Amino acid sequence: MRRIVLSSLCLLFWPSHSWSQAKPTLSPAVSVFVKEDAPVVALAHVRVVDGTGAAPRQDQTLVIADGKIVALGDSAVTKTPVGAKVLDLTGRTVIPGLVGMHDHMFYPSPGGGLPLYPEHASSFPRLYLAGGVTSIRTTGSLEPYADLELQQAVDRGKLAGPKIHVTGPYLEGEGAFALQMHQLKDAEDARQMVEFWIARGATSFKAYMNITPDELAAAVKAAHAHGIKVTGHLCSIGFREAAALGIDDLEHGIEVDTEFLADKKPGVCPNPQAAAKALLAVDIAGKPMQDMIHDLVAHHVAVTSTLPVFETSVPGRAPLDGRVLDAMTPEARVAYLTRRARVSDNSATSDAPGIFKKELEFEHEFSKQGGLLLAGLDPTGYGGVIAGFGDQREVELLVEAGFTPVEAIHIATSNGAEFLGELDKIGTLAVGKMADLVVLEGDPSVHIKDIEKVELVFKDGIGYDSAKLIDSVKGLVGLR
C-alpha cells in the first residue's frame, strides 16, 4: 500500500506537461475506434480484478500515463493527478487484457468442398480487440507472411488489433488434410523450416497431427536453440512422448491425446473414433491419466484450453450467440447453422458430451496439480467460434470446469503472459505494467457472463470503443 500511495503523491506534484510524451501516430483506420486517448486517464471508483488470482478490490482508482499504469489503489488515498481525464466507473470492473493463446487469424471457408481457411486479417484483429483480447499467439499460421505483415501494421498504428505473437506455419507430416499446409519430408526438412521462419520473425511453432517423432525432435531442438517454444496439436504422438521430446505446450487437452488407445502404432495418427472411445474409458483419477499429468507437470509442459471449439460438437450445447451470427456473412451463417443442426440430429449416438465432460475434468485436475493452463478459442471447427467472442466464452467455460471466476480470469490473462515471457509487462494489473486492460459493465467475479459486457479496451494506454469495433466488421466473418 505504501508504494501505491507514494506513486499517487508523486503524480499530484508532477507538472502536467511531463505527461506529454509523444504517442505512436494512429492512422485514421485506427483512430476512428479510439474513445480515450488523453495524456493521463484516471479510472475512478472501479472494481479491480487484477489477474493475480487475488480477491476483487472495491472502489479503486487506476491511473494511466504514457501507456502504463502509474498508480493503483483505494480511491480514498489514490489522488487524481492535475489535468487528468477522470472516468467515474462506479459499478464497473477492470480486468487485465485477455491473452489469447490459440487465436488464429483464419476461419473455415463456408460452402463445403476442399477444406480451406482464408485469412481474416480485416475482421479478426478488430474482433479480438473488441472482445478484450489485447495480446494473442496465433498458434499456427496458414498465411505466415500475412500474419507477420499484420503484426507490423498493428504495431505501427496502421490497423486496429491486439499485440500479435506470430506462430510459424504448421509443422505437419504426411497426410495433411488442408492444402494450405506444407507436409514435412523428414527431420531435416523440419529443422530447415524452423530456421527459415525464425529468420523472418516467427516467435513460436506448432507441430501438427501427422508429424513424426523424429521430425518433432528436430523441430524442438532447432527452436530451442533460438529460445523459441514449440506447441502441438498432436495425434501421431501421445502427450507423454511429446513431453519427453521436449515440447513446451500441448493444445486442446486430452480431447486429442491418442496415447490411451491400446493398439496405437508409434508415430501414426489413429482412427479418431477409436481414440475417442478409448478416452471415454479412462478415469481422470486413474493411474494412466495421473501418470500423464505428472509427466507434463514434471517436464513443465503447459496445456492450452480451447473449450469453445469443442463445445460446438456437443449437441444442443453451445449458446446461439446473436453477436456471432451478426458478424458472419449470410453464407457463413447458413453453413454454420446447417452444421449445428446436423450435430443435434446425431445426439443419440454422439460421444461428444462424454468427451467434453472429461476434458473439463482434466483441465481442472491438471491445474490443481500445478500445471500451467492457458486459454484460447480456436476459431475453426465448423465456424461457430469467432475471434473475441470465443475468447470470452472460453473464460465462461473454465468456470464450468470448476474454476472460480477469479481463477478463470487469472488463467486467461496472467498464465498466458507468463508462458510468453511477458508477465513483467502484461497479464496482471500493477504499477509499472503496460495499460492493457478491459473495462466491463457489471461484476464478472460474481457473474462470469459479465465478461461479455465490454465497454472499453485499453491497449498501451489507448482506450478503444468495443461497440464501434464490432459494428465495423458486421457481415465480414467468412469472407475476410
Question: Positions of the model-derived regions?
Answer:
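Bacterial N-terminal signal peptides
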Residues: 7-16
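Boundary at the C-terminal end of the N-terminal hydrophobic targeting segment
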Residues: 18-22
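Histidine-rich, glycine-flanked metal-binding segment
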Residues: 25-28, 33-35, 48, 53-95
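C-terminal helical cap
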Residues: 46-48, 349-352, 356-357, 377, ...
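Metal-associated gating/positioning segment near the N- to mid-region
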Residues: 93-158, 174-177, 182, 188, ...
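Divalent metal-dependent hydrolysis catalytic cores, especially in the metallo-beta-lactamase
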Residues: 124-144, 162-169, 198-211, 229-231, ...
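Active-site neighborhoods of metal-dependent hydrolases
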Residues: 193-206, 211, 256-401, 476, ...
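C-terminal cap of metal-dependent C-N hydrolases
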Residues: 431-477
